Structures are given as C-alpha cells and as structure tokens.
C-alpha cells in the first residue's frame, strides 16, 4: 500500500507504507538528519510512517533538535546512574526535557545523590556516548510492560494511567525506559553536555509521595553554545536575588515560621515604596482611583465568584463566630463590591479602580522560590469597568501605561494575544468584538504580537507581556484580561442612555504583576545596583579620619535636607574598608571628605564602579543628583 508524503518544498511523493524518515533522508541525500516532524509531531528517524503526511526532516541546526538530543541525554543520565549504583538499587521516576535542559528523578536505595556525585556520573555518560549505542523504539502491550518494569514501581504507576493497551518503550544497550520520545538514532550523536545540580522533588509533585533525587543537566549540539550557556548560568547565579537580597539587606525569608512569605527589611521597603510611588503617579495622571479592600471576606463572596469551587485548595480560611471567611487570593471580587456600592450611569464610565492589594495563595513548599514564587504577595491590580464600545480605547491606555513603566526600567518586551477557547462562556459575537478591539489597540499602539489561537481563559481573551532582562531572560509580568464571567456572576451593570440596565465590561490588568516578584526581577536585572532613584541609600559620605567628621557631617546633612537618602559613615574602620563596604552595598555615590575638601569647600565624588571626580562643587552635586532622581535616570549622571 502506498502513502503520500508532502515535503517542505511543496512536492508530494509516493512511498510504501511503513517507510521511515531515515529512508526518505537517504533518498534525498540529507545525511545530517536526526529526526523528523510528521504532521506537526516530532518523529524518530527510524519510526515507520503509516499514513499520508507532511514531513520535514530535522538536523542539529533546526529549532526542534534540542527536544531530540536533550531527551536522549536524560536517558543516558539514567543509564549511567543505573550502571554506577546498580539496577537493583535505582528506581526511576521521569526524565523530561525542560527549557534549556533536562532532568531525571531517581529513588536510590540507602542514600541520595549529591553534587559531589555529578563528575563520576558525567564520566559514565561519556562512556555511553562513546559506545554510540543504537536507540530502538518499540510498542508493546501493557502486560509486557508490567513484566518489563516489574521492579520499577514508579513506571508501573505510569503504565496504569496510559490509555489503551499499548505503550512505547525505548532501548539503548541494556537500558530500557517507558517513554513517548522523540529520541536520537543513537547515543553518540551529541557529546556536549553538563550536569548542573541536584535537588529534592516529590514524586508527581505531591508532598504525600516519596521525595526523589532530581538531577538537572543541559546539552547542546555545539561546544561553543554549551560554554556560552554555562557562562550565562554563572552570570545568572551572580545575580540571584536569593543571594543578593540578604546581602544587600533588602529582604529575608523564614521557612520555619512563614514559608513563602517574605520579610522586607528597611532598605527593601525603600525600594518597594519607590516602586509604588512611581506607579501611583502614573495611575493618577491616567484617571485611576486608588482603593483599598479587605484582606478577609466572607465565604459567600468566594462562592459567588467561583473561587470556592475552582480555587479553594489554594486559599486560606478562617472560622469565627460560626462564620467562615477566606483570606483573599484575588482582588477582583472586592473591586466589584466597590463598583456595586452605588448606581452607575453610562456617563460615569469608564471607572478605573486601582489597588496595591495583598493576596495569599497556597503554593506547595517544593515550588516556593525566593520572591519569584511565594504565598503572600502584593498585586498592582486594577479593574476597569466600561461599555463594550470603550474597550479599544481603554486597552490602548493600558498599553501606553505598560510601555511607560517597562521603559523606565530598561525592559524590552514581547506580546501575546490569546483568543477564544472551545470551552468559552458568553456569546461568540461579544468574543469577536472584544478580540477585535484588543487587536486594534495593539496595532494602533504599534506593537507586534503573537496570536495564541484558542488559548484564552474561558471567560475572556487576554494579552500577556514577557519582559526581557539585561541578560536576556524572559519573565511573564503584565496581563490584560477581559472578563465576561464576573460581570454575569455579580450582575455588574450600568444605566444606559435608554434608562435600562446593561452589562458592563470588566478588564483586569496588572503591570508589575506581583510587586514582590517584580522586585526580585529588578534585583537580578540590575545585579543589585539599582538606579539612584531606586537605591535604598543614594549617597555615602565618608570622612577620611575622625578629625574630618564635623565637616563631613555638614555635607551629609546638606544633601539629606534635599530629601536624598544619605549614610554618614564615620565608623572607626579604615577608609579602604568603608569604601569597599559602600561598593559592596552598591551605593551609587560616595563622597570622600579629607583635609583638601575641608580647605577648598569642594568634595571628591566616587561612583560605585570606581570612577573618581575631584573638586566638585557641593551645590552642583546636589543639583545633578536632583535631576538624576527626578528624571528617574537609569544611568549614574556622574559616570557620563
């Protein structure tokens, strides 16, 4: 029987049913093929093709290639661990690819792997790569799979969850794994890898299950790419907010008494207050009204909103006086209550409510991560209530606000629009009108965007913003979400020109997203060296010796009177030590006062990067600092 295969150049060829991509690659003279994409699905090079299809061969240069070779590298890792620690002592979890790498989970009898074990595992992996073992894909019955994995309890659990009676396994030498693929044709194709770290991970992510050992690694087709990625990781580690935050006395974490709930220290509160001040200024200019809603509200509110049915496991509850309350996980129901506290006319719209709202959401302890994944956080939440005809202009206003805020920190960003899913609520005509309004606003703002068809929330289309930091990482932050569900549930209406009630449109939006998470991103983006307007201490005044204290204190007082944050460092430490401390604390400016400065009335300024400017008029410095802070410059003015 023949099948038709359509190739990337548009040509259609006939082949015998069961032909493999490897055979097609040979016919086409493509010697470097490592796999294929068949009807959009990643496909092993030696896997038979049974039906008509579109086919594109994959080489190591193609964007799909990492999925093949990193998946295979995860199997090589598992094979190496089983060789080193004994098949009878190693129970296998799962070993998927992840962004920029892979991992495998192990349950090892009488012990756990540590990072000291990684070098010897790497050596064993190199042996397996050198052996260049053929990798074979095979479909077997569940009964055969149960027998094959009879000593692997985690695999047996997975087998039972697979639909149908057939499962896929992969074999390389003596190693066999339950896997859907895809994989390389053999173990020797990609040689450039590195094991990165070891951590604990609960089986299936549940704390009720055993704790396994997770080994992370990465792999690249070229050594140069691997080396560059390892340098990137080193730089990311240097910027890690979990390390810099405590070092710079910005925040602390206490996992014993408040896991996932950061404590902000005085210097960290300065930064948070500056972030909120900046945001408030922009919101006031754009007609937002700031409100403040309760932290705890009756359970009935959350039943109406739907959180009770769909989000209860992530909420915290309190029972008092035979009434049950919930600590709010979101701000929207509270904002709706404010809206509904009076009759709203179409002439009042749009109404823009804004709040720095503290919310609490339960997260498993295993996924908590510094300020990036917490249980208690503050959202810069706003809800816009408007008519359907006002959607486009309101979205355009939000887009401008987002651009203004992100530009202030030097972030570039990309935009994604997610549209109506199959299981949507509400009238399709309303969806169409709303989606068109979002597209029009994006285009009027001059923003290019990617459309994720069918990936919107069931209650409305949304726009997501992914900011790019100074070392190229992306963070999803701002969201603009149209909501057709909450106005229905809470009967959110306005009185129209016809003196009748009409359903209002509700737009959710956050820009920082989580204030705590955005703070963490900024720490890493700036490597702790905040622009002067954000810096907890803006100027350190350092007398050279005790006899210079009085003169230096006058300088410190003068600068402080102008509203700047000044640290007068007259500690009985060496001058070099105090300068190094100021640099370690990443204070933008240091003023050094000695005999020469006291005699001349001038000051010597040193920036945190080490640049020295002598004979500076104090008033000129104050004016320069004022302009730098008021304009919220990213760079230090005196380094220009």
Curated annotation (Swiss-Prot):
From which domain of life does this come? Bacteria
The catalysed reaction is: tRNA(Thr) + L-threonine + ATP = L-threonyl-tRNA(Thr) + AMP + diphosphate + H(+)
- EC class: ligase
An example Gene Ontology cellular component term from the record? cytoplasm
Q: Which GO terms describe its biological process?
A: threonyl-tRNA aminoacylation
A molecular function GO annotation: threonine-tRNA ligase activity
Domain TGS, first and last residues per copy: 1-59
**Record-linked SUPFAM superfamilies:** Class II aaRS ABD-related, Class II aaRS and biotin synthetases, TGS-like, ThrRS/AlaRS common domain
Which key words tag this protein in UniProt? Answer: Aminoacyl-tRNA synthetase, ATP-binding, Cytoplasm, Ligase, Metal-binding, Nucleotide-binding, Protein biosynthesis, RNA-binding, tRNA-binding, Zinc
Q: What does the record note about the cofactor?
A: Binds 1 zinc ion per subunit.
EC number(s) from the headed UniProt entry: 6.1.1.3
The UniProt record lists the keyword Zinc-finger: no
What is the required cofactor set for this protein?
Zn(2+)
| Subcellular location, record wording | Cytoplasm
* Stored InterPro entries: aa-tRNA-synt_IIb, aa-tRNA-synth_II, aa-tRNA-synth_II/BPL/LPL, Anticodon-bd, Anticodon-bd_dom_sf, Beta-grasp_dom_sf, TGS, TGS-like
Q: Which PROSITE patterns match?
A: AA_TRNA_LIGASE_II (PS50862), TGS (PS51880)
Coiled-coil segments: none
Q: Name one Pfam family in it.
A: tRNA-synt_2b
Which segments carry the region annotation Catalytic?
240-531
Task: Give me the residues that bind Zn(2+), please.
Answer: 332, 383, 508
Q: How does it assemble?
A: Homodimer.
Q: Which family would the database say this protein is a member of? A: Belongs to the class-II aminoacyl-tRNA synthetase family.
PANTHER family under this entry? THREONINE--TRNA LIGASE, CHLOROPLASTIC_MITOCHONDRIAL 2 (PTHR11451:SF44), THREONINE-TRNA LIGASE (PTHR11451)
Q: What does this chain do?
A: Catalyzes the attachment of threonine to tRNA(Thr) in a two-step reaction: L-threonine is first activated by ATP to form Thr-AMP and then transferred to the acceptor end of tRNA(Thr). Also edits incorrectly charged L-seryl-tRNA(Thr).
Protein name in UniProt: Threonine--tRNA ligase
Which organism does this sequence originate in? Thermotoga maritima (strain ATCC 43589 / DSM 3109 / JCM 10099 / NBRC 100826 / MSB8)
Which gene name does the record give? thrS
């Amino acid at each position: 029987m023949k099948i038709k295969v359509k190739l990337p150049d548009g040509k259609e060829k006939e082949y015998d049913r069961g032909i493999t991509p490897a055979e097609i690659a040979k016919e086409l003279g493509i010697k470097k093929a490592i796999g294929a994409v068949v009807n959009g699905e990643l496909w092993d090079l030696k896997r038979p093709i049974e039906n008509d299809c579109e086919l594109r061969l994959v080489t190591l240069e193609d964007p799909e290639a990492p999925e093949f070779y990193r998946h295979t590298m995860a199997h090589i890792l598992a094979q190496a661990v089983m060789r080193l620690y004994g098949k009878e002592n190693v129970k296998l979890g799962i070993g998927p690819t992840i962004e920029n790498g892979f991992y495998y989970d192990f349950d090892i009898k009488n012990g756990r792997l540590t990072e000291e074990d990684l070098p010897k595992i790497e050596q064993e992996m190199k042996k397996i790569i050198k052996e260049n073992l053929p990798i074979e894909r095979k479909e077997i019955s569940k009964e055969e799979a149960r027998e094959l994995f009879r000593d692997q309890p985690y695999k047996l659990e997975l087998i039972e969850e697979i639909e149908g009676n057939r499962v896929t396994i992969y074999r390389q030498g003596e190693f066999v794994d339950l896997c859907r693929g895809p994989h390389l044709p053999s173990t020797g194709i990609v040689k450039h890898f590195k094991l990165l770290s070891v951590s604990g991970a609960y089986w299936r992510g549940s704390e009720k299950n055993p704790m396994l050992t997770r080994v992370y690694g990465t792999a690249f087709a070229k050594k140069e790419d691997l080396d560059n990625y390892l340098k990137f990781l080193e730089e990311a580690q240097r910027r890690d907010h979990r390390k810099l935050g405590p070092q710079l006395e910005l925040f602390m974490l206490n996992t014993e008494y408040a896991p996932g709930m950061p404590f902000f220290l005085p210097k960290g509160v300065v930064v948070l207050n500056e972030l909120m001040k900046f945001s408030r200024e922009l919101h006031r200019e754009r007609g937002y009204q700031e409100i403040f809603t309760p932290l705890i509200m009756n359970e009935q509110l959350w039943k109406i909103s739907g959180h009770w049915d769909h989000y209860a496991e992530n909420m915290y509850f309190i029972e008092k006086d035979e009434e049950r309350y919930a600590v709010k996980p979101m701000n929207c129901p509270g904002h709706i209550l404010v809206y509904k506290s009076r009759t709203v006319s179409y002439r009042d719209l749009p109404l823009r409510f804004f709040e720095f709202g503290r919310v609490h959401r339960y997260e498993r302890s295993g996924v908590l991560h510094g300020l990036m994944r917490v249980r208690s956080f503050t959202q810069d939440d706003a809800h816009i209530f408007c008519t359907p005809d006002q959607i486009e202009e309101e979205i355009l206003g939000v887009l401008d606000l987002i651009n203004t805020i992100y530009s202030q920190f030097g972030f570039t960003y990309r935009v994604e629009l997610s549209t109506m899913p199959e299981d949507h609520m509400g009238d399709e005509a309303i969806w169409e009108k709303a989606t068109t309004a979002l597209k029009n606003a994006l285009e009027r703002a001059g923003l290019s965007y990617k459309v994720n068809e069918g990936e919107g929330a069931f209650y409305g289309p949304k726009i997501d913003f992914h900011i790019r930091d100074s070392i190229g990482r992306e963070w999803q932050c701002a969201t603009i979400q149209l909501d057709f569900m909450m106005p229905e549930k809470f009967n959110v209406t306005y009185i129209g020109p016809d003196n009748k009630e009409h359903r209002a449109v509700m737009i959710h939006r956050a820009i920082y997203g989580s204030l705590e998470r955005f703070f963490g991103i900024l720490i890493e983006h700036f490597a702790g060296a905040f622009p002067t307007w954000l810096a907890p201490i803006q100027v350190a005044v350092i007398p050279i010796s005790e006899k210079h204290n009085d003169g230096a204190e006058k300088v410190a007082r003068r600068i402080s009177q102008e509203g700047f944050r000044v640290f007068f460092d007259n500690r009985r430490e060496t001058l070099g030590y105090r300068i190094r401390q100021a640099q370690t604390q990443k204070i933008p400016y240091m003023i050094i006062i000695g005999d020469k400065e006291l005699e001349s009335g001038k000051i010597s300024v040193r920036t945190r990067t080490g640049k020295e400017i002598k004979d500076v008029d104090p008033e000129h410095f104050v004016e320069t600092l004022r302009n730098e802070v008021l304009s919220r410059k990213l760079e230090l003015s005196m380094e220009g």
